[in-house]
A protein has these predicted regions:
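Long, repeat-rich segments with strong aromatic
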Residues: 212-321
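Amphipathic alpha-helical segments that form well-ordered structural scaffolds
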Residues: 149-150, 207, 273-276
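Fungal secretory targeting signals
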Residues: 1-26
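Residue-level marker of regulatory loop/turn positions in helix-turn-helix DNA-binding domains and
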Residues: 91, 197-200, 266
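Extracellular glycan-targeting catalytic surfaces
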Residues: 23-190, 202, 229, 251-255, ...
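Acidic, Ser/Thr-rich low-complexity linear motifs
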Residues: 135-139, 195, 242
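Loop-centered beta-sheet repeat module
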Residues: 179-214, 218
Length: 398
């Protein structure tokens, strides 16, 4: 295990040295494994598998079938996302990391070393080859989405005795991904603060937080948490869920999301990412789920109520892209494997009314043969890989 954690500074790039050469910060105690999953989580999951308890066992069968121990990675030296002077190849990364995650989970739950070796093979291929992430502005999305996913795979594998590549994986994430995460939150690609929608900040925060935990860097973790609480970008909590309504009849809060007037594909993605950031933070002792009177729950209830076919109120929203006077019905009813995590925490752990989140979870399960799938289960394009998924076996409590 590393004796000290590494943090990036802009100065490092400016003077032409590696981020890992910039300076080190002594970490506080960070719990491992402690991103999306903890040891207690895996003990619970193993119990469900042993008991063949439904619907969790249905989720396990789906996950186990997806974990291909013979998977061959397609690592690239340069990942390109977005039209630019490069040829887009980022699908190689999101497909590989989804395969690594499934294999790492199956190893951790079932103990099969072939699955561990497959996940290691994928991680080592990327950490030994990747040098840059380039492309249009979409490169910032790649650094965020695939950064948090890679970090979660590495966090699971860190307990595998056969893996000698943890330091190399950390170096890749700290040297390549984190500087982009930090730069985006500071500069937003040189654009006005409301130019980039909430999901851009949120995936960036998920990556920054997860890389901080993986590398035992409390300063990096704090950077993500502080920005989420007080930042000026659209992914900060008060901006991501920017207006609170009172539901007619129940009186419970419904939080209008920043992307509600854009389309429901992105509006629901925001809550997948909010769930990731909150779950990772909760496992490190910081409860973002309850922040500002359970604001994430209010937003989840609003978004999912609309996406299961119910009407919600809408307040006119204006940003750099124009003015939305009505909620968007584009992609209404979109299917994402994100409801299990949010419902398990708010209803199962907190005992709160999360009825619309539960109905959305059930709608996704009805469309998914009874259990959430994962990367690749919901289409071959990047949107089908934005969330890691498999929530029925990983998060379901009842």
């Amino acid at each position: 295990m590393r004796a000290s954690a590494i943090i990036s500074v802009t100065l490092a790039g400016a003077i032409g040295i590696s981020v890992t050469e910039a300076f080190a910060i002594e970490p506080r105690r960070i719990v491992h494994p402690g991103l999306l999953h903890t040891n207690d989580d895996f003990a619970r999951i193993k119990g469900y598998v042993a008991a063949q308890a439904s619907p969790q066992y249905d989720g396990w069968l789906k996950l186990a079938a997806a974990a291909n121990a013979d998977y061959t990675p397609n690592a690239q030296a340069s990942v390109c996302r977005g039209s630019s002077d490069c040829t887009q190849n980022y699908a190689s990364l999101y497909k590989d990391v989804a395969a690594a995650y499934a294999n790492a989970l199956v190893w951790r739950i079932r103990g099969t070393t072939d699955n561990a070796k497959a996940a290691v093979r994928i991680m080592d291929a990327w950490s030994s080859k990747l040098t840059e992430i380039i492309g249009s502005a979409d490169r910032w999305l790649a650094a965020g989405l695939y950064g948090y996913q890679l970090a979660n795979v590495a966090e699971i594998l860190r307990d595998y005795d056969g893996w000698t590549g943890l330091d190399a994986a950390i170096k890749m994430l700290v040297d390549i991904f984190y500087p982009m995460n930090h730069d985006f939150l500071v500069r937003h690609n040189g654009a006005s603060i409301d130019n980039y929608w909430a999901n851009w900040d949120l995936c960036t925060l998920c990556a920054m937080h997860s890389i901080g935990v993986l590398s035992d860097n409390q300063t990096m973790v704090n950077e993500a948490i502080t920005y989420f609480k007080t930042g000026s970008g659209m992914g900060a909590l008060a901006n991501a869920i920017w207006y609170i309504w009172s539901e007619e009849g129940s009186g419970k809060p419904l939080g209008q999301g920043q992307e509600a007037g854009r389309d429901q594909g992105h509006a629901t993605l925001d809550f997948g990412l909010l769930g990731v950031l909150a779950q990772q933070s909760y496992n490190q002792g910081t409860d973002l789920f309850s922040l500002t009177s359970n604001r994430i729950l209010a937003g989840s209830e609003y978004a999912f109520k609309y996406n299961v076919g119910q009407d919600v109120p809408f307040k006119t929203y204006t940003n750099n892209h124009g003015t939305a006077t009505v909620i968007s019905n584009s992609s209404r009813g979109t299917i994402r494997p994100i409801g299990e995590l949010l419902y398990a925490h708010y209803n199962g752990v907190k005992g709160l009314n999360a009825s619309w989140t539960g109905k959305y979870r059930d709608m996704v399960l009805d469309a998914s043969d009874g259990a959430e799938g994962g990367g690749g289960s919901y289409g071959p394009n990047s949107g089908g890989y934005d969330q890691l998924g498999w929530g029925t076996i990983l998060y379901r409590l009842d």
